[in-house]
Amino acid sequence: MASPHPRKKRIVQKLPSLTQSCNGELRPCPECLQPHFSKIPILSQLITEHKFMCVSEISAHKVVFKLPKSWFQCEHLKPQEDAVLGSGSFGSVKPISKVTCAKYFTDPVDFYHELIACNLAALAQIRNSTRAIYLVRMTGAYIPCKCILFPRYAGSLYDFKCWDKISAKKLAKEFKSLVNAVNFLNDEVGIIHSDISTSNILVAHGPDFPGTFLLADLGVASLHSGNHQTELCVKNSRGKILYNMSCTRDIFLLCKDPVKPAQVIFRCYLLACKLINSETLHQTFIVGKILAQNIDMASLFYTMLECVEKMLDTKDIKPSREFYNKIGPDDESHKAYFLQFLVPRVVLLEMLSRLWDTKLSIGIDSFGNTTEKNVLEVQDKILFASWCTHLKGFLHKGGLQLNLNKLRAQPLYELVRFFLKFDYFSLSGRQ
């Protein structure tokens, strides 16, 4: 019997969808992606990469990108006029279809900054797709209307309401996956996210609600010192400079205040007390690779603790928000302003310490005692202790301590211990 014609035996290998995985979640499926990218011909990979920015010039310290022609033609569907999925200082996010949304920017500087960061991440995702599945990937960009396309998800943890459906094991599983996303950005992309928070962690659709958690929004991401080049530039086809990305950062402006690392808050406090040289420490600089990882891991940890509070807060009294609104100072010139953001994490860690019969500490307790000797001035130590007492009162009022047993899960305990390695209330973090 003659063998079948080879063309009839050929299997056409399609690019796995980046918006619909085989289990129904709006994310790349590792089972689908890994075989694809391990077998894809190099020519096909180059064609895929051609849809993104490519390097046109390289110097000792600078890389110049040129933009693909496809980005100058708006071929995407028009968004629904009145539908807005989210908004901020950058602009707004609008739905394009059931599986795609567009992030529109009002300022071209913000647009090109995020576009560069997303471009670097997208190219790294092609090279190592498995490690990147918990990071939201751009699927297109259009210069004329200043928008970047992304897969559409169910919403963010900031707006999430169904905390009764989240178990301690589920929370630990999802945040352990987000650790992979942070490591991917640090190791493979060479950037610090620097804006991890509940508003930038999205929840995917899936057969089991809630779905997978994914890290999003590279709007303020920047290079760390693990890169050979520390400056980036975007030019159009005529050589006109569209954007220069400064890779220097002010460490005091990294992360949202409620999840700012304790070691950063330590420096902010010393600076306010004039115990360190502001001219030295307040200068902008390129964040080191290890410091970048510590900062992102710490902010991810404190974001998880915010989720722990939400899981315990069955009466929805929002104790930490109540504390910030009624007790904590809102004037950044207040010497102890940044200390208030230590209060929720210190109190929650003491609650978890009692639950698990262990000591969980970031170098300061609810009485204002610090591992570093003579850090807080006497009046600030008394003030900090009173703040912790106020928050404990809010927690008791909401009965959060009565729900602690739902956190009895070994994976969550192990993850908390893991996160504690990355931050401490001292000048150099945990040694």
Swiss-Prot record:
Stated role: Phosphorylates the antiviral nucleoside analog ganciclovir.
Active-site residues annotated for this sequence: 195
UniProt cross-references to Gene3D superfamilies, sorted A to Z: Transferase(Phosphotransferase) domain 1
Single Gene Ontology MF annotation: ATP binding
Protein name: Probable ganciclovir kinase
Residues annotated as domain Protein kinase: 79-368
Family: Belongs to the protein kinase superfamily. Tyr protein kinase family. HCMV ganciclovir subfamily.
Organism: Saimiriine herpesvirus 2 (strain 11) (SaHV-2)
EC number: 2.7.1.-
Binding-site residues for ATP, renumbered to this chain: 85-93, 103
SUPFAM superfamilies in the record: Protein kinase-like (PK-like)
SMART domains in alphabetical order: S_TKc (SM00220)
Cleaved signal peptide residues: none
Keywords noted in UniProt: ATP-binding, Kinase, Nucleotide-binding, Transferase, Tyrosine-protein kinase
Record's keyword annotation contains Nucleotide-binding: yes
UniProt KW Kinase keyword: yes
Gene field: 36
Coiled coil spans: none
